[in-house]
């Protein structure tokens, strides 16, 4: 009796044999028509083959073999791996970059994940009420919230305690200028001007406490502009106002300007009394023409100052000076605001221009020699010549003396104004 077909199929699969080693069958059997028994055995063998691969370990299903041949268009730019789908490539790239876009939404949990399935698996921990981890996370979240609230309250209380007390309003401020503008209502006397200056500068005397630097500078600027306007209107006209010519450049180079003094006071030693002592024996300038002027003579002001300028020399030439032009705005130098005198100054009558001594530049002096019209009216052309100018005889020592360069000899006892007029 021949073996069953199923046993023949398993034996053939487990022990394959070459066709040459198999015994030859009679020709009549191979040429004989197939019987129903052989068809049944072939169908059983096919079914056994189809059921065998899932049972064998390490074998791939037959339907996954074509998938290995599918294209992988999504390649990782950081490594050599390629993927069939874009989301797989994106998920893989996050392993390189460390990006974790999926954050847990549970309050108090700060965990993040790079994959959505990891977030889903993690969220089950919070959703499970019986989980010990869930209870621990809830306790930690509550403790963190309480600590944050306590920290906010502590910061608020510290800020309130460290805040400085409300500052008191500043009662000492720069007084408002009450001197009217010269264009509107200029003062008409020195007493009126001195009264206004006292009201403006009364609290800023030499020994009084000064306000802050900002108010000091503003007050200095206001006083400087006011003094400049008043001097342009001719209020500083003293009996020796015409003596300024010999020391005009000296005052420009030696007197401390108002702006420079304000800047130096603000930036260097604005609250030191040593500077007051240093200036007290060198510069004690009060307002010009003041009867209580304490200004020393200019030879004691600087070592290289040789001008015999008198003590009460004004700082600007009056507009109606007999021989000299008034100083311009750029040449005007003001005294220190702290050394201005606040005493009343008597009103002085305007000084009339009176020539003192010979004045070679006076236009009223008669001409010496023929005039130009007389020379041009002569009939002879050879006589139409200008005469040789008459130069005043001046000694060489006088020309070389510093008097013509705004600094004269300190040994000279002559008055600056008259001496200069004689030299001209």
UniProtKB/Swiss-Prot annotation:
Bias kind Basic and acidic residues: ranges: 62-72, 271-280
Post-translational modification: Ubiquitinated. Deubiquitinated by creB, probably to control its activity or amount.
Keyword Cytoplasm: no
Subcellular location: Nucleus
Zn-finger (C2H2-type) residues: 74-96, 102-126
InterPro entries: creA/MIG_C2H2-ZnF (IPR051007), Znf_C2H2_sf (IPR036236), Znf_C2H2_type (IPR013087)
GO CC terms of this entry: cytoplasm; nucleus
Polar residues: compositionally biased ranges: 39-50
Keyword Repressor belongs to the record: yes
UniProt-listed PROSITE patterns: ZINC_FINGER_C2H2_1 (PS00028), ZINC_FINGER_C2H2_2 (PS50157)
GO BP field: regulation of DNA-templated transcription
Feature: compositional bias, Low complexity: 21-38, 288-302, 406-416
Sequence segments annotated as region (Disordered): 1-74, 115-134, 161-184, 266-327, 347-386, 403-424
Keyword set, alphabetical order: DNA-binding, Metal-binding, Nucleus, Repeat, Repressor, Transcription, Transcription regulation, Ubl conjugation, Zinc, Zinc-finger
Domain of life: Eukaryota
GO molecular function: RNA polymerase II cis-regulatory region sequence-specific DNA binding; zinc ion binding
Family: Belongs to the creA/MIG C2H2-type zinc-finger protein family.
Role description: Transcription regulator component of the regulatory network controlling carbon source utilization through ubiquitination and deubiquitination involving creA, creB, creC, creD and acrB. Represses the transcription of the alcR, alcA and aldA genes by binding to a GC-rich region in their promoter. Also plays a role in response to carbon starvation and the control of extracellular proteases activity.
PANTHER family xrefs: REGULATORY PROTEIN MIG1-RELATED
Subunit record text: Interacts with creB.
Protein name: Probable DNA-binding protein creA
Lineage, top ranks: Eukaryota, Fungi, Dikarya, Ascomycota, Pezizomycotina
Primary gene name: creA
